[in-house]
Amino acid sequence: MKEKSADVIVVGAGIVGLAMAYHSAKKGKKVVVIERSQQAQGASIRNFGLIWPIGQPSGPLLDRALRSRSTWLEVAGEAGIWLHQNGSLQLAHHQDEWDVINEFYSTNSHEGFQIELVAADKAKQLSPGTKTAGLKGGLLSSTECTVDPREAISKLPGYLEKKYGVEMVFGTVVTSIEKDQVATADITWRGEKIFVCSGADFETLFPETFQQSGITKCKLQMMRTGVQPHAWKVGPSLCAGLTLLHYGAFKDCKSLPALQTRAQTDMPDLIKWGIHVLVSQNGNGELVLGDSHEYGLSLSPFDREEINQLIMSYLGTFFEAHDMAINERWHGVYPKLEGKTEFVARVSDHTTIVNGLSGAGMTLSFGLAEELTNIL
């Protein structure tokens, strides 16, 4: 069996692994990334492509998200990745939603967020697909960006190879890691630092560590339309009232329980499947819609059309576009550790697991990787 070496070995070429490779290589390290597929096929390519700082609470997590955003702007420009700094617009069609948004604005407008309250007519100007019937107003944020995750995850490896000399090894399964050795079918790699960024695959490497952590998996269902006619644009990425219940940025709002109570009473099926709805638009003009949240270690590979219909029904309460015909449906699975924003475990002197960003990988990975490569 051949032996090769690197300063840093990264297992997994999803966004977490690529971020670890980027910040390691930027520090002058010789880096190799080993990925089991010919290109990462997991949650990193099955999401909205949203860099979403507005969802993170003020403090360290918002700072991490904003650092990630800065890195995305730099990397996308250099790698030829389409990135749109289109911001986000959170719509409120009910008074309890408007109460939460106003409270959030009053307590967070000077906490690092770049936000403003907008009236219903301004919301319609910003996003022509907004439905104005019953619209109270919205929360406009300028920090959110959109990429096409399929393009980004495809182009980042070549960028890392060309600019930083990162060696990308695709179609290769890591079978074991012991001390400073990473074994594949035909090569044993030696590395001073090893980062395991295996996404939703908890079973192959260090399964006992994952089992002890209490980490689980989340399945989300998503859809994509065709290209919108006449170069129609959504404007800022959109969301509505249920999104206020999903993100940690809003959890301390004293007005949130009233919204939670109404949602459980009036929309029990949406709550059951963890549905809140986001709308993003990629560079081709296609709309990406979703999503739902089902949790467990053995999630069904079969999607529920009921969930897709619930998503589309709720979407129809606040948004419409020229062409809402669905061209693609899929699901993604990401790791989640309840009550935590990431799972970082030092399993040996050489090896660290970096995982479990709980659905915020596009938003937080570059910032987390910067922090970890500074201290490990």
Predicted regions mapped to residue ranges:
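Glycine-rich FAD pyrophosphate-binding loop
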Residues: K26-I45
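N-terminal Rossmann-like FAD-binding beta1-loop-alpha1 element of flavoenzymes
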Residues: A6-V32
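Active-site substrate-recognition segment that forms the wall
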Residues: Y22-H23, I51, W82-L83, S198-M324
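Helical element adjacent to the flavin cofactor pocket in flavoenzyme catalytic cores
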Residues: L140-E178, W189-K193
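Dinucleotide-binding Rossmann-like beta1-alpha1 core, especially the glycine-rich loop
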Residues: F48-L126
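Core beta-strand elements of the Rossmann-like FAD/NAD(P) dinucleotide-binding domain
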Residues: K4-A6, T184-K193
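Short beta-strand to alpha-helix junction loop
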Residues: D63-R64, L91-V100, L139-G158, F302-I307, ...
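C-terminal catalytic lobe of FAD-dependent flavoproteins
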Residues: G274, N282-V288, E294-L376
